[in-house]
UniProtKB/Swiss-Prot annotation:
It is an enzyme of class 5 (isomerase). Pfam families: Fucose_iso_C (PF02952), Fucose_iso_N1 (PF07881), Fucose_iso_N2 (PF07882). Pathway: Carbohydrate degradation; L-fucose degradation; L-lactaldehyde and glycerone phosphate from L-fucose: step 1/3. Mn(2+) binds at residues 337, 361, 528. InterPro entries: Fuc/Ara_isomerase_C, Fuc_iso_dom3_sf, Fuc_isomerase_C, Fucose_iso_dom1_sf, Fucose_iso_N1, Fucose_isomerase, Fucose_isomerase_dom2_sf, Fucose_isomerase_N/cen_sf. PANTHER family: L-FUCOSE ISOMERASE. This is L-fucose isomerase. Its EC number is 5.3.1.25. SUPFAM superfamilies: FucI/AraA C-terminal domain-like, FucI/AraA N-terminal and middle domains. GO terms for cellular component: cytoplasm. The active site is at residues 337, 361. The gene is fucI. NCBIfam families: fucI (TIGR01089), PRK10991.1 (NF008220).
């Protein structure tokens, strides 16, 4: 079982003994327990285990008790804190001073004791000391004996906790570059300063010859390989598509069979490189058994590898999927072309939702007029104002087929613990594996092809690094859409019929970048996007503020934005205030 960070709950109290403190002990501790129960009951880690909370041993009224709480949290592996109170407390004495923890304060809205006054006072202290904290204050007054958590308070607590757990989970992990820069793509020029200072992560790197060495020297689990090949024969190879290569570039059946064996070994080895494998230690490969402690990775592929060896499409697709030959499991995060910037956006989406993430080229904007000209048909329904073609070189998660269903029977991408064996088979059945286009991939291989079901709410994200500014984040909430099959066929075949397609329509609003579908495409900051199931823009914005990454483009309603209270001091324009606050505070780990 993986070890995850915990969330610390800090019940603070008026320190005046002799009647005041004693009258508040039970109430304050009950609020702390209610917050812990809320989080544990609603939030899960990537493997499906509940997010754990640690409550201070007692209420915190004076600085010695703050220090004792801090020591306990360090021992217990806490990665973020929520301070809870129903009364006045001594602000600077009782506040959380750990500079690395995301922190929030819930001040109970009651009349008998001034929880709101403490909230305001301690948030002022956090702002003055440069330790931003999220303020949580219920809209409606509660009675003193009411220990329930109002819906608006619960929403903010869970939004904070979800993002804070993501921050703490990635801290101390690695991003593994398998290979180096792919085709001059800026996102694959990996910036170690960004990872270290903003995410608290380290960068690991291997030359792709390491994969060949492990194949040649048998540094992989042979039993697992046999199991993996049998599974691949049953579920993937049987869905091998037509070979569209010209005759002189078409591989023989024997060569294709060798490619299947090669890419299955490659998948096992890439996974072992990321997380290690205790089986390798049993086989005598102690160093290789360790792995690189990678929570995310990227595979360069093009051009040096793919010009000579089978491409990484199968390996990337399977690793990014919530299942493989070992059964249903948490999806990995692996960026095509080692685009680390997109890999980070995928990591954000995965940690916030516990779902597999789609990696795609943001390939083409199709206007209604262009579609009519090319196909003779009109886009209708949600696609009527134009569509964005999200497509990748056969390396997209199979969860993206939309063959999983939610409680309402609608297409979905689900956390691994909700996925059924029947849904696994549907995802596999909906995927065709085409021999790779050898104009692009001279070494061959196989590319996944599917068409995502329409009607899924999704959020497209992208992290960009800007010289002189630093990282910025883009967010576009929208939906996958289904279009007329004849329109899809014509548009798909003039793009690449061997690759997976997701037709995307963003939610439009009065912001310039979202005035129409074309503007979303025109304002996108790079060639790739990370697509997560669900409208999670609010959570992404909260996470970005914790990491001091400004959001330059989003279509989230302003009243849904939840950032640290200190952001209010940087002006009433939320976008400008975000930039000013992130610049002022700078990265957490610098």
């Amino acid at each position: 079982m993986k070890k995850y960070p915990k969330i610390g709950i800090r019940p603070t109290i008026d320190g005046r003994q002799g009647g005041v403190r004693e009258s508040l002990e039970e109430k304050t501790m009950n609020l702390a327990k209610a917050v812990a129960e809320l989080i544990t009951s609603n939030l899960k880690n990537g493997d499906g285990t509940p997010v754990e909370c640690v409550i201070a041993d007692g209420t915190i009224g004076r600085v010695a008790e703050s220090a004792a709480c801090a020591e306990k949290f360090e021992r217990e592996g806490v990665g973020a804190t929520i301070t809870v109170t129903s009364c006045w407390c001594y602000g600077a004495e009782t506040m959380d001073m750990n500079p690395y923890y995301p922190k929030a304060v819930w001040g109970f809205n009651g009349t008998e004791r001034p929880g709101a006054v403490y909230l305001a006072a301690v948030l002022a202290g956090h702002a003055q000391k440069g330790l931003p904290a999220f303020g949580i204050y219920g809209r409606d007054v509660q009675d003193l004996n009411d220990n329930s958590i109002p819906a608006d308070v619960a929403e903010k607590i869970l939004r904070f906790a979800r993002a804070a757990q993501a921050v703490a989970t990635m801290r101390g992990k690695s991003y593994l570059s398998m290979g180096s820069v792919s085709m001059g793509i800026a996102g694959s020029i990996v910036n170690p300063d960004f990872f270290q200072e903003y995410l608290g992560m380290r960068n690991e790197s291997i030359d792709l010859t390491e994969i060949i060495r492990r194949m040649a020297e048998g540094i992989y689990d042979k039993e697992e390989y046999a199991k993996a090949m049998a599974w691949t024969e049953k579920y993937c190879k049987k869905n091998e598509g037509n070979d569209f290569n010209i005759p002189e570039k078409t591989k023989t059946r024997a060569q294709k069979d060798e490619d299947w064996e090669f890419i299955v070994k490659m998948t096992i080895i890439m996974r072992d490189l990321m997380q290690g494998n205790p089986k390798l230690k049993e086989l005598g490969f102690k160093e290789e058994a360790l792995g690189h402690n990678a929570i995310a990775a990227g595979f360069q592929g093009q051009r040096q590898w793919t010009d000579f060896y089978p491409n990484g499409d199968f390996s990337e697709a399977l690793l990014n999927t919530s299942f493989d030959w070992n059964g249903i499991r948490e999806a990995f995060v692996v960026a095509t072309e080692n685009d680390a910037c997109n890999g980070v956006a995928m990591l954000f989406g995965h940690l916030l939702t516990n779902r597999a993430q789609i990696f795609s080229d943001v390939r083409t904007y199709w206007s209604p007029e262009a579609v009519k000209r090319v196909t003779g048909k009109e886009l209708t329904g949600m696609a009527a104002n134009g569509i964005i073609h999200l497509i990748n070189s056969g390396a997209t998660t199979l969860d993206g087929t939309g063959q999983q269903t939610n409680a309402n029977g609608e297409p979905a991408m689900k956390p691994c613990w909700e996925i059924t064996e029947g849904e696994v088979e549907k995802c596999l059945e909906a995927t065709t594996w085409y021999p790779a286009n050898r104009d692009y991939f001279r070494g061959g291989g196989f590319s996944s092809n599917f068409l995502s079901k329409g009607g899924m709410p999704v959020t497209m994200m992208r992290l960009n690094l800007i010289k002189g500014l630093g990282p910025v984040l883009q967010i576009a909430e929208g939906w996958t859409v289904e279009i007329d099959p004849e329109i899809h066929k014509l548009l798909d075949e003039r793009t690449d019929r061997t690759w997976p397609t997701t037709w995307f329509v963003p939610r439009l609003c009065d912001k310039p970048a979202f005035k129409d579908v074309y503007s979303v495409m025109n304002n996108w900051g790079a060639n790739h996007g990370a697509i997560s199931y669900g409208h999670i823009g609010q959570d992404v914005i909260t996470l970005a503020s914790m990491l001091r990454i400004p959001v330059c483009m989003h279509n989230v309603e302003e009243d849904q934005i939840f950032r640290p209270a200190a952001w209010n001091a940087f002006g009433m324009d939320k976008e400008g205030a975000d930039y000013r606050a992130c610049t002022t505070y700078g990265p957490i780990y610098k």
